[in-house]
Amino acid sequence: MAEAPASPAPLSPLEVELDPEFEPQSRPRSCTWPLQRPELQASPAKPSGETAADSMIPEEEDDEDDEDGGGRAGSAMAIGGGGGSGTLGSGLLLEDSARVLAPGGQDPGSGPATAAGGLSGGTQALLQPQQPLPPPQPGAAGGSGQPRKCSSRRNAWGNLSYADLITRAIESSPDKRLTLSQIYEWMVRCVPYFKDKGDSNSSAGWKNSIRHNLSLHSRFMRVQNEGTGKSSWWIINPDGGKSGKAPRRRAVSMDNSNKYTKSRGRAAKKKAALQTAPESADDSPSQLSKWPGSPTSRSSDELDAWTDFRSRTNSNASTVSGRLSPIMASTELDEVQDDDAPLSPMLYSSSASLSPSVSKPCTVELPRLTDMAGTMNLNDGLTENLMDDLLDNITLPPSQPSPTGGLMQRSSSFPYTTKGSGLGSPTSSFNSTVFGPSSLNSLRQSPMQTIQENKPATFSSMSHYGNQTLQDLLTSDSLSHSDVMMTQSDPLMSQASTAVSAQNSRRNVMLRNDPMMSFAAQPNQGSLVNQNLLHHQHQTQGALGGSRALSNSVSNMGLSESSSLGSAKHQQQSPVSQSMQTLSDSLSGSSLYSTSANLPVMGHEKFPSDLDLDMFNGSLECDMESIIRSELMDADGLDFNFDSLISTQNVVGLNVGNFTGAKQASSQSWVPG
């Protein structure tokens, strides 16, 4: 203890050496040094009364300790030149030795000897003049209460947090409530740290912290002020945590919002219900998969994709008008797939009847069928029993054979599209039936194109042409009842047109093409079955309406969906007989039906509702090749070969029984797909 009076002289050089960058007081707060509290109490042993201020961290000392810090900085400038890095390092080593010895409870007097003995020779020589530093530690240890109290402050103003200060401010008010501005005023008035920080420049930081704590902690509640234009009151939440930090309020976001979760769940349920409803109401997909050679039996995913596509476009909003051209409607295919088209026909309808999809029930169309029955234009009349049988066939399950395959004959201006469950069809559907008057005066060929994966299509045709205006066709006395079949081919759903034209006769024709599902019938229903080994085509002919017997050679026929426009425009030039062939996955050919008195008539003599028949007053000349090249090839990049090929192979004779007319042969050119 005798060395205590001499301690101030050697202490100041040591403190100067430590102050510039290695001040011991900053280490506990920065958590970079495991500095013990006893060593903090021992190191700032100065005879002056500023021990408490010296033990503080510089940022906490603030303005009150500026004078002391300035004095130490001045002394550092005065002595810094003679110190050097070696002296600074020796001071640091001495501090480490003091830290090791002080917590161990050793005698302070033995500290310097131990520290000096444990150091190297060069460093020990530097520490010799500074060894009198540790003896004053007992004097500092006696008054260690104040330094400990000051150095344990959490914030610059003390141990209280912002939330604690706000709580005290609110509790100190008579009404136990304060506005935000009143809280600011209380801070400046009652907390010494904020006394000189009330102006706008220096108060931005701590005022923002107060606002943050008010919103963060659940112990504070905001109450609406009764007066208009006044800020809200902040009160202490009686249910909130009074001590410590309350749980934070989570901001409402897309992840934790219950409302969003519920709405998302409802949307998912609605979507699932919409998807399951068409599947349960109709077994058309199962019918499609039962076809052994059908392209739809390969992948149910493609069928599902087409089902979703048709459900999206099954509305008037998806079409411009009821008389939309098939060329324009074909652009809808591009929305679904670019490489492969959906395995379904493109269905067209007038504005009075939406285009139904294969995946939807057929019961909705029943009233419309009944209504349309009264507007049919029949040459020799269609009996009510036959119509009743036809309507009854709509609800037949796939396992039941169709009792009658009667064709529904009606005027040419209305195409009717039904669903995949089939109109009088056990395994397929009447996808489109268009009946129109036609003239039987001449024989006309028209190439019926079928699109298959951008492959060149070659069309075989017959050699008779005729020039007849649309007006003549419309006003013709001889009517032929023809039907158009929506057929399914592999790359594109081809729209096929089969001709069953008759004068003074009714007949029932059942046609079944494997990739094309139209007017399918069981093989035992007809009198003639022409089966292709590759496609399993069953085309049968039902009983005739009289004693007439029609023996037709039936084979595949397919049209692309866009061929209806081209063929309709050819009809304006009076196409009477057409020969076509389909390029699908397997072989395809052409079919020719003839019940005319003089010439066999092709069934594509129809006028779909796509054509505005009111605008034609005279003859209309159309160039089929230019139409296809401009509208079809430009859109899809298809390659067509219009070389007329008349092949003599696979020639099937067409026999017309009980009819006054010449027999004609239809030639079929089988081209591998």
Swiss-Prot record:
A motif (Nuclear localization signal) lies at residues 242-259. The modification N6-acetyllysine is found at residue 242. PROSITE patterns: FORK_HEAD_2, FORK_HEAD_3. Residues 300-673 are annotated as: Mediates interaction with CHUK/IKKA and IKBKB/IKKB. It is found in: Cytoplasm, Cytosol; Nucleus; Mitochondrion matrix; Mitochondrion outer membrane. Residues 57-68 have a biased composition (Acidic residues). The modification Phosphothreonine is found at residues 32, 179. Residues 157-251 bind DNA. It is linked to A chromosomal aberration involving FOXO3 is found in secondary acute leukemias. Translocation t(6;11)(q21;q23) with KMT2A/MLL1. This is Forkhead box protein O3.
